[in-house]
């Protein structure tokens, strides 16, 4: 060890002038936020104004500065990459070259911004040739993005080493964000904007200029939908309208193909956007070899520089339509997930179609205003010079005499400015009051400019400049005139570059699917502890007064008990959360419909469960894409977290993680919340706590969450309820021994999370532990199911309203040894207003009739 080493470490010694102590959690959080915002604003998301990310903008500006324009010769890509990296973008050369190459690909960009020469990749996924072999220059339409950039139209900032200035945004003569689209993944967010037809986008922008109150539907009269560079077909228009109206949507894109029934051949002419042709052919061949697709004997790729042509030869006797449908199910259709996310004033925002165009127009108005101010200043300067020249020509003899008799050039200028007096033979010459700029110009005039013809030209130019000044002042003083300039320039761009649509629309008729054959109806779904699952129509369970035994709802094998029951619609999407913290997705109609006396089907045939995994909570909705807000989850040991619903849009068949769990903990309940709800957590021992949802910050799927309630002893969480005061009036609690109560929401005061809470219901020997806690409103019905498979349906109004810390009333009459297993609410919208309550005897009689009907059905 060196003898120079210090004996002890002193804070700050040899490190910094000041050492600041900080909690590592705070430092990590702030550093991560800084990193995230750097990625969001500096790399991954496009600016709404010019539709470019920084790397695209820097490449184009570097080419502009180097003179690599559309009318210049091509330059080596390595040279362009080097200049971009050296002057503006200090990152890896491969990232810059990949971006440059993509801007040159006509199958990636609807209107390529780079004119490439050489191998820049292919639709088969072939990579571009090395940058030393390829050459590039700006395309003509790319120059429109930089037009007037030298007229103070946009702000500039210092480059990374303060040597040069770079634009923060390009002037952008057309709405490039919509025209060429964009995609990127940032921290916690992503963007995926499809390309569009330039002519349609210009027409929509002009419509918005002329009619600022235009709706999305009005704009869609011009913009029919995405226009992909690879063509293909968009299936239906509803998804497109939703994407334009909300900024998010899923658009189905189908390959364009021809079916030749007599020849036994299917020919694919166009592929969905971003589909890899080589991989598509490989996947089809694999499915044919594995027997998943029948009737195909050969696949040939006959594509050339004129377009795509994939020929699928059918076996003798194979039905072309059947094979086509198999291909559509697996290969010839893809989904383009629209996320119209862009930077607005440096902040990421999801934008509607109208908002996107409005932000572009705001930018363009600013550009045209600044350009007009710049040109006005130049015109006024020129008019000032011309005015001086005209005055000089009117007094040419005196001006020449003054200059000739001045001792120096500076004296001549001073004399023209009227600052000194010039004498000839003792007599003073006339004085002038030219400005410094005029004097400088007059002194520099050549004798040839003193001709009468030159004077006429100066006067004509002066009149033209005055007209220009008047025009520019009109533009700057009248918003409608400024908008007229924008409109005219947009239409010029359209005339120069617009082309026909490549992507067509096909009706969303398609083939008859299983879903088309299943009627929409409200159903009760029952899940057992051994993961047997089935569904039954809600109509099979007639409402009765509380205190009844209900009717048989399912058959159970020995040792099995009911785990959960919930009410949904056959066409709903189901998110099935398990005790292991996983979530799975399926359609409600995928759950087999069976009689009340049937056992059900093993859920492992529907969901890929691990050993010991069982469903503990289900969230259902009309369409998974329509869920907005958060999924709020609670665990058995009192942890709670909420995660944005957008994190659950693409759930694998094997499930995905919904929440991280500590060893020995389990996920017990999940609620959909809107970000402004109050939450009530209930425990098995009858405690409850109400707090604002904002106290639980949004987290990712793999986070554990925070403490929601402080549990005492061996108490555990029974469930969570979200309060929507517009629809909910009471908290309804049910215990395992069949007792329950309704309590007004006001009885549960709001506290801070992680408290012990208040007594909700007495969980004594008579009542037993709490089984479920729900929020209910007028007209709602309750579905209560016991361990042994009995189901009771009763209106919530039939259950007494009492305070907290009370015993409650009998809800379900249980047989000895039986217990309440699960409770769910039938919303008032699902109940029939004219429905009459049955007493227990009539329910038993109906049960016998239903059982006979079920037996006949089976």
Swiss-Prot record:
Its EC number is 5.6.2.2. The active site is at residue 133. It is found in: Cytoplasm. It is an enzyme of class 5 (isomerase). Residues 833-858 are annotated as: Disordered. One of its GO terms (cellular component) is cytoplasm. CDD domains: TOP4c. PROSITE patterns: TOPO_IIA. Residues 849-858 have a biased composition (Basic and acidic residues). InterPro entries: GyrA, GyrA/parC_rep, Gyrase/topoIV_suA_C, Topo_IIA-like_dom_sf, Topo_IIA_A/C_ab, Topo_IIA_A_a_sf, Topo_IIA_dom_A, Type_II_DNA_Topoisomerases. GO terms for biological process: DNA topological change; DNA-templated DNA replication. It catalyses: ATP-dependent breakage, passage and rejoining of double-stranded DNA. GO terms for molecular function: ATP binding; DNA binding; DNA topoisomerase type II (double strand cut, ATP-hydrolyzing) activity. Residues 833-848 have a biased composition (Acidic residues). HAMAP family: GyrA (MF_01897). Mutations in DNA gyrase result in novobiocin resistance in halophilic archaebacteria. Few gyrases are as efficient as E.coli at forming negative supercoils. Not all organisms have 2 type II topoisomerases; in organisms with a single type II topoisomerase this enzyme also has to decatenate newly replicated chromosomes. Heterotetramer, composed of two GyrA and two GyrB chains. In the heterotetramer, GyrA contains the active site tyrosine that forms a transient covalent intermediate with DNA, while GyrB binds cofactors and catalyzes ATP hydrolysis. This is DNA gyrase subunit A. It comes from Haloferax lucentense (strain DSM 14919 / JCM 9276 / NCIMB 13854 / Aa 2.2).
């Amino acid at each position: 060890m060196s003898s120079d080493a210090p004996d002890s470490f002193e804070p700050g010694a040899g490190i910094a002038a000041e050492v600041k102590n900080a909690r590592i959690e705070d430092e990590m959080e702030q550093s991560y936020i800084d990193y995230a915002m750097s990625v969001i604003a500096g790399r991954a998301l496009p600016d709404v104004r010019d539709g470019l990310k920084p790397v695209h903008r820097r490449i184009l500006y570097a080419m502009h500065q180097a003179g690599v324009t559309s009318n210049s010769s091509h330059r080596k890509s390595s040279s362009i990459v080097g200049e971009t990296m050296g002057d503006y973008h200090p990152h890896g050369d491969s990232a810059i070259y990949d971006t440059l190459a993509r801007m040159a690909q006509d199958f990636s960009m609807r209107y390529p911004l780079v004119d490439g020469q050489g191998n820049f990749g292919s639709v088969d996924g072939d990579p571009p040739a090395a940058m030393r072999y390829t050459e590039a220059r700006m395309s003509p339409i790319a120059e429109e993005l930089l037009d007037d950039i030298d007229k103070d139209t946009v702000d500039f900032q210092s480059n990374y080493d303060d040597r040069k200035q770079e634009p923060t945004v390009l002037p952008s003569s057309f709405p490039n964000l919509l025209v060429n689209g964009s995609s990127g993944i940032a921290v916690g967010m992503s963007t995926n904007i499809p390309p569009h037809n330039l002519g349609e986008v210009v027409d929509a922008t002009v419509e918005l200029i002329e009619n600022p109150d235009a709706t999305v539907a009005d704009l869609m009269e011009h913009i029919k939908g995405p226009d992909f560079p690879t063509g293909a077909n968009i299936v239906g228009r509803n998804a497109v309208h939703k994407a334009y109206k909300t900024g998010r949507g899923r658009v189905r894109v189908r390959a364009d193909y021809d079916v030749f029934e007599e020849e036994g051949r299917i020919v694919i002419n166009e592929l969905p956007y971003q589909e890899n042709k080589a991989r598509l052919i490989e996947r089809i061949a694999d499915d044919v070899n594995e027997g998943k697709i029948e009737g195909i004997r050969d696949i040939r790729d006959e594509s050339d520089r004129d377009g795509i042509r994939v020929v699928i030869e059918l076996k003798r006797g194979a039905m072309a339509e059947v094979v086509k449908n198999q291909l559509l199910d697996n290969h010839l259709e893809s989904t383009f997930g629209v996320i119209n996310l862009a930077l607005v004033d440096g902040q990421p925002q999801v934008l509607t179609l109208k908002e996107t165009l409005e932000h572009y127009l705001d930018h363009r108005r600013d550009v045209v205003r600044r350009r007009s101010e710049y040109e006005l200043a130049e015109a006024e300067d020129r008019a000032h010079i011309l005015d001086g020249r005209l005055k000089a020509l009117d007094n040419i003899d005196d001006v020449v005499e003054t200059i000739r008799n001045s001792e120096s050039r500076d004296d001549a200028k001073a004399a023209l400015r009227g600052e000194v007096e010039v004498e000839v033979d003792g007599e003073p010459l006339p004085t002038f009051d030219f400005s410094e700029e005029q004097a400088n110009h007059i002194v520099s005039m050549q004798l040839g400019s003193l001709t009468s013809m030159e004077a006429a030209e100066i006067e004509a130019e002066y009149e033209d400049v005055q007209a220009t000044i008047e025009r520019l002042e009109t533009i700057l003083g009248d918003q409608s005139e400024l908008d007229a300039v924008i409109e005219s320039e947009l239409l010029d761009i359209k005339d120069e570059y617009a082309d026909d649509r490549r992507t067509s629309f096909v009706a969303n008729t398609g083939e008859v699917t299983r879903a088309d054959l299943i009627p929409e109806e409200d159903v009760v779904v029952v899940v057992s502890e051994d993961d047997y699952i089935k569904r039954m129509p809600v109509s099979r369970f007639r409402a009765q007064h509380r205190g009844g035994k209900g009717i048989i709802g399912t058959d159970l094998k020995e040792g099995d008990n009911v785990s959960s029951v919930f009410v949904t619609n056959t066409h709903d999407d189901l998110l099935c959360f398990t005790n292991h913290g996983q979530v799975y997705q399926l359609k409600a109609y995928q759950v087999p419909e069976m009689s009340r006396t049937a056992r059900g089907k093993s859920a492992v045939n529907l969901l890929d469960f691990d050993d010991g995994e069982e469903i503990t909570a289900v969230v259902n909705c009309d369409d998974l894409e329509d869920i907005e807000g958060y999924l709020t989850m609670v665990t058995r040991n009192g942890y709670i977290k909420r995660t944005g619903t957008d994190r659950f849009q693409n759930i694998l068949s094997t499930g995905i993680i919904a929440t991280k769990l500590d060893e020995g903990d389990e996920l017990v309940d999940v609620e959909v919340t809107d970000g402004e709800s109050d939450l009530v957590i209930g425990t098995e021992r009858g405690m409850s706590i109400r707090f604002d949802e904002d106290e639980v910050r949004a987290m990712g799927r793999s986070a554990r969450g925070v403490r929601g309630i402080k549990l005492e002893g061996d108490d555990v969480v029974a469930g969570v309820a979200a309060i929507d005061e517009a629809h909910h009036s009471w908290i309804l609690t049910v215990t395992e021994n069949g007792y329950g109560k309704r309590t007004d929401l006001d009885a549960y005061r709001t506290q801070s999370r992680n408290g012990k809470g208040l007594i909700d219901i007495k969980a004594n020997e008579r009542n037993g532990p709490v089984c479920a806690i729900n929020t209910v409103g007028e007209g709602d019905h309750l579905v209560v199911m016991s361990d042994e498979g009995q189901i009771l349906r009763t209106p919530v109004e039939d259950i007494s309203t009492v305070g907290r810390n009370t015993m409650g009333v009998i809800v379900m009459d249980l047989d000895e040894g039986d217990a309440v297993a699960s409770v769910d609410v039938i919303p008032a919208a699902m109940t029939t207003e004219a429905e009459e309550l049955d007493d227990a005897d009539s329910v038993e009689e109906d049960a016998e009739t239903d059982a006979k009907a079920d037996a006949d059905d089976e």
